[in-house]
């Protein structure tokens, strides 16, 4: 089983590549604030359409700002968190420096150049129009090169490891890296109009194009926003709680179940469309099956705190990590439920889906990322966290923001679905489209308020981390975080 061992003096002298991890943390916080700010702006645009209406500035349009928001929070914030944490975790659990020397810096800078290429493209109207895959061909090619370097760096570090066992967090990181590479390559197969022009056309068309897109879109959620962040969960929760993973066997079941099941669930995004009925049913079936291994992972994460539950009262960082797992469980129950055709008939195309996505994005991805960064900054800069009280403020501001956001969207979405399908005694639609939109207005305002509170909490975090780096109390060497070590296999 996996236990904890303290660092030896030899371990302390071993040099790890920490500068690139620091850069990833800084970039993640920058893009996180930027992406959330754009999210608040577009939420206000939906609430008060004339507030940010500049007809002469096309880049301020909702249609251009919305993909900027999603890419900034998913790929810029989330991607930098994953790169930084994976580089940190693989070194510590392998007791080996990152392979490839400066290749890790190429990954960091190359990835952030991709973010700039994609984001500037959105603002000037250069986009493929494929959700979560909007960047055009030139940005896609650049990301492919960077991603190969990322894979080589990670695999090379695993290859030169000094620990005989590959820790479970690294399985999830590797699954995320490999699967995203396959998804990216297939979904972005396209032909440029000219190598001197930005426009390209997909090699797929019609229903095949839709299926390929949502095979990518769903599994971008499954492997970018789930598998990668589960790697964070399996390292940082045991580390912070100073407890071994509750069940290593359960983590094996969790891992392989996700690998084999998640990839089939994409068609549930295309229920009641031109997609063949058998494919829709297949997507629904695998989505429902997916609930069980997902909750197995949630139970494994929560039960890792066995014997350490009292720490939740005194450690707000650990509380944030644990609450993220609770949101993971909630989102992975709601998702399969919404894939059932009878439920999907009500929820599809409504704000219920928006609420579901953000319960996972803000609660699961956001909180597990924040928790990891709160751990990393003191470890990397060798300074005590400036203020636990500010972490408390961050936690409660953000939690209130999440609750306002997702509950308003749940209510708005269910109301929206019911109004769309309401008929009068003559068989005509009961409500005009404009009436449905008008009914959403109060909930849009609540959603914007929730997003503003979440952004406010993140700004509190930025201030706390800034004060930690610039003026925090220096940590004694003996307080360095312990390293996971394989003691003896059962």
Predicted regions and their residues:
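Hydrophobic cores of alpha-helical transmembrane segments in multi-pass integral membrane proteins
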Residues: 2-4, 22-126, 137-158, 170-195, ...
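Cytosolic juxtamembrane amphipathic/interface segments immediately preceding
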Residues: 9-23
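Active-site-proximal inter-transmembrane loops
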Residues: 203-212, 347, 352-354
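Membrane-interface helix termini and inter-helical loops of multi-pass transporters
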Residues: 128-131, 273-276, 345-348
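Long amphipathic alpha-helical scaffold segments
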Residues: 2-6, 15, 311
């Amino acid at each position: 089983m996996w236990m904890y061992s303290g660092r030896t003096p030899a371990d302390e002298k071993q040099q790890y590549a920490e500068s690139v991890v620091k850069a990833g943390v800084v970039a993640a916080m920058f893009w996180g604030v930027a992406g959330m700010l754009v999210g608040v702006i577009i939420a206000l645009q939906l609430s008060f359409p004339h507030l940010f209406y500049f007809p002469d500035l096309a880049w301020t349009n909702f249609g251009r700002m919305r993909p900027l928001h999603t890419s900034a929070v998913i790929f810029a914030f989330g991607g930098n968190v994953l790169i930084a944490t994976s580089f940190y975790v693989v070194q510590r659990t392998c007791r080996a420096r990152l392979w490839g020397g400066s290749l890790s810096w190429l990954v960091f800078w190359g990835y952030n150049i991709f973010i700039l290429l994609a984001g500037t493209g959105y603002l000037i109207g250069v986009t493929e129009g494929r959700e979560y895959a909007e960047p055009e061909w030139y940005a896609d090619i650049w990301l492919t090169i960077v991603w190969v370097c990322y894979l080589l760096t990670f695999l090379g570090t695993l290859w030169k490891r000094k620990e005989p066992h590959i820790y479970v967090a690294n399985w999830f990181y590797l699954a995320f890296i490999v699967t995203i590479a396959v998804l990216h390559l297939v979904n972005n197969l396209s032909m440029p109009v000219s190598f001197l022009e930005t426009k390209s056309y997909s090699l797929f068309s019609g229903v095949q194009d839709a299926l390929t897109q949502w095979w990518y879109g769903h599994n971008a959620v499954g492997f970018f926003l789930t598998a990668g962040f589960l790697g964070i969960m399996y390292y940082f929760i045991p580390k912070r709680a100073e407890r071994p993973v509750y069940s290593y066997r359960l983590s094996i079941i969790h891992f392989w179940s996700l690998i084999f099941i998640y990839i089939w669930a994409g068609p549930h995004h295309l229920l009641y469309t031109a997609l063949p009925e058998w494919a829709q049913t297949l997507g629904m079936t695998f989505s429902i099956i997916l609930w069980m291994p997902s909750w197995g992972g949630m139970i494994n994460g929560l039960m890792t705190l066995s014997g350490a539950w009292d720490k939740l009262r005194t450690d707000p960082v650990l509380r944030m990590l644990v609450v993220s797992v609770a949101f993971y469980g909630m989102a992975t129950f709601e998702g399969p439920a919404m894939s059932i055709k009878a439920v999907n008939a009500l929820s599809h195309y409504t704000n219920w889906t928006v609420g579901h996505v953000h319960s996972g994005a803000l609660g699961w991805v956001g909180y597990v990322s924040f928790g990891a960064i709160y751990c990393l900054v003191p470890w990397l800069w060798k300074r005590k966290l400036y203020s636990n009280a500010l972490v408390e403020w961050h936690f409660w501001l953000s939690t209130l923001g999440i609750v306002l956001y997702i509950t308003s969207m749940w209510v708005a979405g269910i109301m929206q679905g019911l109004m769309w399908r309401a008929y009068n005694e003559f068989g005509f639609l009961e409500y005009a489209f404009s009436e449905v939109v008008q009914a959403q207005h109060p909930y849009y305002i609540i959603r914007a308020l929730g997003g503003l509170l979440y952004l406010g909490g993140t700004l509190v975090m930025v201030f706390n981390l800034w004060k930690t780096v610039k003026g925090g109390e220096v940590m004694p060497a003996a307080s360095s975080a312990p390293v996971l070590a394989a003691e003896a296999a059962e």
